Amino acid sequence: MMENNRNYLIAIALSVMVVLGWQFFYMNPRIEAQRQAEQAQQAQQAKTPATQATPGAAVNGALPGQTQASATTSREDAVAKSARVEINTEALSGSINLTGARLDDLRLKGYHETVDKTSPIITLLNPADTKDGYFAEIGFIGGEKSGSVPGPSTVWTVKDGQTLTETTPVTLTYTNETGLTFSRKISVDKHYMFTIEDTVANAGGADISLAPYGRVTRYNKPAVASTYVLHEGFIGVMGSGDGKFASVEAKYAAIEKENETNAKATGGWLGITDKYWAATLVPPQSLAYDSRFSHFTDGQARFQADYKNDPVTIAPGQSTTLKTLLFAGAKEVPVVDGYALDKSWFGQAFTNLFAGAKDTVQQYDIPRFDLLIDWGWFYFLTKPMFKLMDFFFRQVGNFGVAILLTTIAVKLLFFPLASKQYASMANMKRMQPKMEELKAKHGDDRMALQQAMMELYKTEKINPVAGCWPLLLQIPVFFALYKVIYITIEMRHAPFFGWIHDLSAPDPTSFVNLFGLLPFESPAMLHLGIWPIIMGITMFVQMRMNPTPPDPTQAMLFNWMPLVFTFMLGSFPAGLVIYWAWNNTLSVLQQSIIMKRHGVKIELFDNLKGLFQRKSAKTK
């Protein structure tokens, strides 16, 4: 049995090493290195003269420069000083700035800043001259014959509609001195997708060439939730023109260092993403374009994701229409998936498996738009985990209960492996007398003892590592669930029961202040809530199902492991801790049933009795 205990402890130790090692030896040094790099970059920028990286507006030139923001003002004043068209939909409120037809005022009605439903709703986009300027705009680059074309300073006129809703689009117009008339129809669905249709009519006497462009601009670098658990910053999917698409990501720090990255593409999309929100542009898919992620230090520092299409030519008396999509909102999985065109076999399989998930979302067939949500390298495991959890949620209406049901489903999936694990443990226990005889026979001759043990395993058809593999195989499941709880907006502010009001946040209670009975806040390093303690108890019970290892070092690990995990998971999302506690509970029940079926004594009560007897003896 000692051999099996050693395998069990090795599996748990590996789990701890993976979690702690990843945190302390991978994440923390890189976070610190990034912080130092950012400080050095900022110091260098302070010494470097400001440069304007967007020269004039030739048809084959760069994008027109941004109008520099004036002194920072309040958001209310910035919105009030410009003529605007109101936005009022089921999901959104805000307005479109008629100067530049810029979307720079957008709030998300369905999301609050805190779990308190009376707290302010989330503000996503802000005017340029506010502290957190963040906006999207679309324009044109003209040539010598085109005259002035729509850009950042163009003042548009409202032709139709005063309020943009799901059912009432608005139309803006602008006519320049050469006879070009620009008509912009803006519509929005009931979620977060804006459709911008630009019709350009040439009433002049010469061919006119225009290059459409679009950009998402963000002033100042936002605070990111994490550096390596998920991606926040620039994101896009670029098409090569032959039906193939590649995902592109860039951190803010990387673009600060490089100033900009460029790529030529046909089809796809690009923008800026946060943990839960995003603003992205989908250029006209039939035109090739130059994409760019950039960082400017001229005046107020800003980050920008932009594209410039190849020029289109409009003959005299003719017109052309170009369609651009703009996503600005919450990264809800069904909505994002509904907008996406996923040609991979994996994506098609899930589309068929969960038919109906897209039915409530208007179809846009945006190439691989589902990658807007960072499912990570284990996409094939993380997304199915969420889909299963979401399925249960739609049945019971509570994500906490959905986590419990998902755990049961995972347990059923791993049941054959778990059965082998516990059967192996039972067989190892039956072989314990023979193993003790071999130890007595060979004494300190480890080589001879090992060979004899292997012969015994072979004769009895026992695999000594069979009990280890099921535990190791569940580690990716743990990380997949962690990723789901951490990145999906569906988990944000999702309640369970009692004191758990946000499954994506740590348990808010703490034993230091007696779980809220004492009137003070506990130190962060000592913050240990009720659910982590419950998890520690279930892990303690699970480990006591097996005999205590005779080796002192193994016995020490055996005793300390639940306590280490309890404190380690104290800062993890409550949903993950609930999963682990429930998983331990199911494992205890499962192990009890299987061991009883094999006629093996369950060691739980004997171990507990022995533990307390040893402690009692030490105190005498």
From Swiss-Prot:
Its main location: membrane. The chain crosses the membrane at residues 7-27, 399-419, 469-489, 514-534, 560-580. Residues 37-77 are annotated as: Disordered. It is found in: Cell inner membrane. One of its GO terms (cellular component) is plasma membrane. Keywords: Cell inner membrane, Cell membrane, Chaperone, Membrane, Protein transport, Transmembrane, Transmembrane helix, Transport. GO terms for molecular function: membrane insertase activity. It is a multi-pass membrane protein. One of its GO terms (biological process) is protein transport. The keyword Cell membrane applies. Residues 37-58 have a biased composition (Low complexity). Required for the insertion and/or proper folding and/or complex formation of integral membrane proteins into the membrane. Involved in integration of membrane proteins that insert both dependently and independently of the Sec translocase complex, as well as at least some lipoproteins. Aids folding of multispanning membrane proteins. PANTHER family: CYTOCHROME C OXIDASE ASSEMBLY PROTEIN COX18, MITOCHONDRIAL, OXA1. Belongs to the OXA1/ALB3/YidC family. Type 1 subfamily. Interacts with the Sec translocase complex via SecD. Specifically interacts with transmembrane segments of nascent integral membrane proteins during membrane integration. NCBIfam families: PRK01318.1-4, yidC_nterm, yidC_oxa1_cterm. This is Membrane protein insertase YidC. It comes from Allorhizobium ampelinum (strain ATCC BAA-846 / DSM 112012 / S4) (Agrobacterium vitis (strain S4)). The lineage of its organism: Bacteria, Pseudomonadati, Pseudomonadota, Alphaproteobacteria, Hyphomicrobiales.
